[in-house]
Amino acid sequence: MNVYQNAEHDGSTMASITNTGMLVIAGTEWSRSEVGSNPNVVGWDTYDECDMLGLGCNGSTYEQNLQQMKNKVAQIRGFNDGRFAFANYSKGILGTYWAPGLMDDFMSAVDAASVDNYMYTRADLQDELNRTPAWPEGANTATSAAYGWQIDQMRKFQSTPGIHPNWIFVESARPFLNASNDRTITPEQMEGAMWSGIIHEARGISIFQHNNNGQAGFGTYSLVQAPADRKAKIKAALAGIQSLAPVLNTQSYVWDAGAAGTDTMLKAKDGSAYLFAGIGLNGGTGSKTFTLPAGITGTQVEVVGENRTISVQNGKFTDSFANEYTHHIYKITI
């Protein structure tokens, strides 16, 4: 982890955060004098969930919320300090009751945005998504693929998909939910959700670290106070993503790998192709066969981080996906 998004303003100095090496997106509680010229403060946060009434913005209509957002961004740009304007959105990306007809304006108002719909843990989201025209009929919200879908939705509301970076929020326990059928996410589900977001072109992963599941060993801050074994799994998942940053920061290629029920992303770096794969919405587990682009000469696929290889036969290879959150990264010589 390298960015503190909307760092809490609790009386600590900004330097006490950035001296650890962390970058910061400063919230509106921080004054310009407190932030100063600190080079590790890279952005200004605007508002949280302005695409829903009665939350981050105080307008009585969505139009008023949008204007409030635009005013805040104008103020930030007036600072002329080189820092980007950031916002977090939520249900507006569903394209139903929230911010009707305005979500493209909310997206274009800022330089980068995240979205938070906690699909694994919030049970009532299934009903909300079933009413969403873009949601595939019969798809289960409590899946990794639901996080990649949210990135797709953000991109749909951009004049050019991906013109500004899109981030996905992933919960790290049970994020202040109180319904009897709400759930606590597992580390394996967290990892799958993060990779689903990346496969769908997320440019950042935000982790919500607040918790109220009441389980022994869990604290309110569900990253720093998590049980040691859980924390180790989350740390390993994040390290795996960071290790592939040089690949992830390259341009993706348009390619259909032909494996039914999967989501894939193709990239290339230093003479190797990388195919990232996970289970898609309504996709099943089990055996999947992938087709490689013409011109790839490698006869062995390295499954990154899993200490195994797969033979390529006639430009194809087959692998297994045990769970809905299973994901694999394939490296092949070009």
Give short role names for the model-derived ranges.
Residues M1-I334:
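Glycan-processing catalytic domains of CAZymes
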